[in-house]
Amino acid sequence: MDALVEDDICILNHEKAHKRDTVTPVSIYSGDESVASHFALVTAYEDIKKRLKDSEKENSLLKKRIRFLEEKLIARFDEETSSVGREQVNKAYHAYREVCIDRDNLKSKLDKMNKDNSESLKVLNEQLQSKEVELLQPRTEVETQQVMRNLNPPSSNWEVEKLSCDLKIHGLEQELELMRKECSDLKIELQKAKQTDPYQEDNLKSRDLQKLSISSDNMQHAYWELKREMSNLHLVTQVQAELLRKLKTSTAIKKACAPVGCSEDLGRDSTKLHLMNFTATYTRHPPVSPNGKALCHTASSPLPGDVKVLSEKAILQSWTDNERSIPNDGTCFQEHSSYGRNSLEDNSWVFPSPPKSSETAFGETKTKTLPLPNLPPLHYLDQHNQNCLYKN
């Protein structure tokens, strides 16, 4: 618009210059033509000048309106931007504040939970320690009971073993009776054969001798089985009585003696018993002190249990001494060398195995009849079994 205003000014100034020039015009044209052209130019100039003024007014109005609109638009834009920014800032601030509050709450809850967990863990540890201490006592009691049970088996096992041994002894006694009956029947048949037919006497003698040798072998085997069972039963009862006596004495002097030494003596004595197929061996050693030396006991009066044990040992020894040798067709059967000695002083019993057929001449044919061995009476075996049961 300034350029247009300047153009208008230039036009007006140019018009003024033309007016100055037209003061003293030189009449080129003549007469009416010059006047008409001059009048047309003046009217055109006036018209153009009026248009320029109108356009300048419109221009100024438009400029004002544009400035007003620009200011209005800028104010509106500032208001919009300021309101949006404030709202966003407010929202962000509120969100940050809420997050901070949540963080503080969670932190306080976490601290509280950690504190509760530490306290509960401490309480649980104390309870666990107390329970472990409570469990240690019954565990030690159970272990001691197991050790005592291993050292001293229950009486029910001994009773079962004794019953089984009694049944075996009864069966062997019945077999022995049957063998005796067969032997007597064979003797009767032999006498009848001698009276009836002297020609067949030799054949019958050989057959009878073979039968008698077999029957005597079976009878002797049954006798030695019975003897072995009796000796094993006697030895088991003796060891049990000794163990019970030691337990009684150990409980009586429990405060004066250490329990470890007593248990070791019982374990050592219980391990010295060996029951085998044909022999039974028991060896007792003197107790060992904690220093490794054998303890010396002063002479004292024997207990009632010892008197019973010695009396039964004397009975069994006399019985075995009477049965040391079994005559068989003129030959004597020699037992084990350690069987005849006095074994009550050194506390060791060794029973020999039954004789074999190769050691004695059972299969030889002889003209003489075989005498029966001197077997112990049955009432003595019953009495010995009763004594063992009473002792147990």
Curated annotation (Swiss-Prot):
Modified residues (Phosphoserine): 318, 353
Region annotation (Interaction with TBK1 and IKBKE) ranges: 216-257
Reported modifications of this chain: Ubiquitinated via 'Lys-48'-linked polyubiquitination by TRIM38, leading to its degradation.
Primary subcellular site in the record, as a coarse category: cytoplasm
Coiled-coil zones: 40-76, 102-135, 166-196
InterPro entries documented for this protein: TBD, TBK1-IKBKE_adapters
Keyword Ubl conjugation attributed: yes
Keyword Coiled coil attached: yes
Gene Ontology CC: cytoplasm
Annotated spans, Homodimerization: 1-197
Locations listed in the record: Cytoplasm
Sorted UniProt keywords: Coiled coil, Cytoplasm, Phosphoprotein, Ubl conjugation
Pfam families found in the cross-reference section: TBD (PF12845)
Oligomeric form and interacting partners: Homodimer. Interacts with IKBKE, TBK1 and TICAM1. Interacts with TAX1BP1. Interacts with CALCOCO2.
PANTHER family with a match to the protein in the record: 5-AZACYTIDINE-INDUCED PROTEIN 2, PROSAPIP2 PROTEIN/5-AZACYTIDINE INDUCED GENE 2
Physiological role: Adapter protein which binds TBK1 and IKBKE playing a role in antiviral innate immunity. Activates serine/threonine-protein kinase TBK1 and facilitates its oligomerization. Enhances the phosphorylation of NF-kappa-B p65 subunit RELA by TBK1. Promotes TBK1-induced as well as TNF-alpha or PMA-induced activation of NF-kappa-B. Participates in IFNB promoter activation via TICAM1.
Protein name according to UniProt: 5-azacytidine-induced protein 2
